[in-house]
């Protein structure tokens, strides 16, 4: 549960800020071990999009790749600043109903615009976590698949299972079928 640590707890477990220059240098140092670049992931990396941009620029200057894993809830201006440095993205598409996104504190249209723009210049894969009773209707899933295919029929959609955790213990795991 590292994402839920307070600043004091983070200090106790040794969480530290890593400047862009240090991360880019470490990525390059690990190249002989097979490292190809940096993936910006866990929590939401675009909360600190300037850090991603600054680091990705340095990583790209070193001839390495940048992969962004995001919820796609960022402005197109931010995306435009990042695209020259990002080689691939995995974007969470949490469902295909505006009401579901609103309950999660997001906006489906913002995410759709982000995805639509990203696929024009970047390798994009999408991930949808199927939550029972929330975004698991065949109608919604078919509508989502049609929309994705309308952008590019070759976009990979990863469909993942939900498991009850943290504040969502009130439902069962997604069935494997």
Annotate the PLM regions:
Residues 46-53, 57, 102-125:
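P-loop/Walker A phosphate-binding loop and immediately adjacent motor/lid segment at beta-alpha junctions
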Residues 9-14, 103-107, 171-172:
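Short glycine-enriched, charge-decorated loop/helix-capping segments at active-site entrances
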Residues 1-88:
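Conserved Radical SAM active-site core
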Residues 80-96, 145-156, 177:
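Structural recognition of alpha->loop->beta junctions
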Residues 3, 171-177:
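Short, intrinsically disordered, charge-balanced linker/junction segments flanking boundaries
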Residues 52-66, 136-155, 174-176:
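Short, electropositive alpha-helical surface patch
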Residues 4-9, 42-47, 72-79, 88-105, ...:
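Conserved radical SAM core fold
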Residues 110-168:
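Conserved C-terminal portion of the radical SAM core fold
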């Amino acid at each position: 549960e590292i994402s839920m640590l307070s600043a004091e707890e983070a200090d106790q477990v040794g969480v530290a800020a890593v400047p862009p220059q240090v991360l880019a240098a470490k990525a390059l140092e690990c190249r002989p071990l097979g490292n190809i670049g940096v993936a910006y992931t866990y929590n939401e990396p675009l909360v600190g999009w300037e850090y991603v941009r600054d680091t990705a620029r340095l990583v790209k200057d070193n001839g390495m790749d940048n992969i962004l894993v995001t919820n796609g809830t960022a402005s197109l201006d931010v995306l435009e600043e990042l695209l020259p440095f990002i080689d691939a993205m995995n974007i969470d598409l949490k469902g295909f109903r505006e009401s579901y996104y609103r309950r999660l504190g997001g906006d489906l249209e913002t995410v759709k615009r982000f995805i639509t723009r990203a696929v024009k210049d970047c390798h994009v894969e999408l991930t949808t976590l199927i939550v029972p009773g929330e975004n698991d209707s065949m109608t919604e899933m078919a509508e989502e698949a049609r929309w994705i295919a309308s952008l590019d029929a070759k976009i990979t959609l990863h469909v993942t299972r939900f498991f009850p955790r943290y504040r969502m213990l009130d439902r069962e795991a997604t069935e494997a079928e």
